[in-house]
C-alpha cells in the first residue's frame, strides 16, 4: 500500500485504524470485517465492564482495595469500548472518501482524528496502569506483612494511586498535539509517540511478569511465609492454591487477665488438602494470565517500534495488533472475576441464569476454597 510509513504513524498516535484504508480503494472491502469485530468488542466490553462496575458499587463485600484498581481499569476500558470502538466501527462502514467529519474540523478531519486518538490513548493508558496496580497490589499482599500492607494501602493512598493513574495518562495524551504531523508536511523520520507507546508497553509487561511470577515463586518456596497474611481471597489469586490450605486458625480471644494465644491448628479435611494437580493448575493459571497480556500487547509493541523508525508495516499486521490490544479492554473483567466466588455470588443474585452457568463453568477448574471463618479477613480484606 502507498505511504505505509505515514499510515503506521497515524495508527500508533491513536488515529483511526480504519481510516488508513482511505488511501487505496482495494482495501475498502476489508474494512467491513474489522468493523464487525470492533462492533462485537464494543458491545461485549461495554456490558462486561459496566457489569463489574455495577456489582462493586452495589455489593459491600466487593468493595476491597484490589477491586478498586479493577474498577478503575474497567472504567477506562468502558470509555474505550463505549466511546471509541463504535466510532471505528461506523467509520469503517462508510464509503471510501466519506469517513471524514465536516470541513470546519481543520478541513481534513485532523482535529477529529486527534480527538479520537486522545480518547483512545487516555483509556488504554489508564487501563494498562490499572493492570499494573492490580499486579503490584497482589504482589505486595504476598510479600509484605499485614501491617506494612495496611500502611501502604490506606484509603487516601489508594485514592491517590487512582488519581495519579488518570493524571499521568492525561499528561501523556496532552503530549500528542505538539507531535501530531502538520497537514501537508513531510512525515518525520522518528515518531516519538510510537516509541513512547512501545516503551510504556514494555515497562508494563516487565512489571506484570515480575509481580505474578514472583507470587508463584514466593508461594512455592515458603507457604508458611504467605500464610501469615490470613487473607480470605488469597486462594483465588494465581498460584496461591497451596497457600490457601496452610492458613492458621484465628487466635483465641484473651481470657480474663490473660493474653491472647493462638489456637492449635486443626487438621484440614481431605477435600481441602492441597494436591499437586491443584498447585500445578494454579501455576498454569498465572502463566495463562501472563500469556494473555503478552499476546494482547507485544504485537503492538513491535508495530509501534517499526512505526517509530518509519519502517513500513503491512495494514493487516497493524489491524491485528490493534484488535488484540482492544480485545484486552473487552476481556479485562473476565481476567479478574471469573474465579472470584464473591463476584459469582453477586452475578447470581443479579442474573440468576447467567450466574449459575458461570459458576458451573468455573467450578470445573476452581481450586477448593476454604470458608471465611477458616481464612479470616485481615489485611487485604479491608473495605474502602
From Swiss-Prot:
Q: Which family does it belong to?
A: Belongs to the G-protein coupled receptor 1 family.
Q: Which SUPFAM superfamilies match?
A: Family A G protein-coupled receptor-like
What the protein does comes down to:
Orphan G protein-coupled receptor implicated in a large repertoire of behavioral responses that engage motor activities, spatial learning, and emotional processing. May play a role in the regulation of cognitive and motor function. Couples with the heterotrimeric G protein complex of the G(i) subfamily, consisting of GNAI1, GNB1 and GNG2, thereby acting through a G(i)-mediated pathway. Plays a role in the attenuation of D1 dopamine receptor (D1R)-mediated cAMP response in ciliated cells. In on-ciliated cells, involved in the inhibition of the beta-2 adrenergic receptor (B2AR) response.
Sequence ranges on the Extracellular membrane side: 1-35, 95-116, 180-195, 307-310
**Official protein name in the record:** G protein-coupled receptor 88
Organism classification = Eukaryota, Metazoa, Chordata, Craniata, Vertebrata
- Coiled-coil residues are none
Q: Is the DNA-binding keyword given for this protein?
A: no
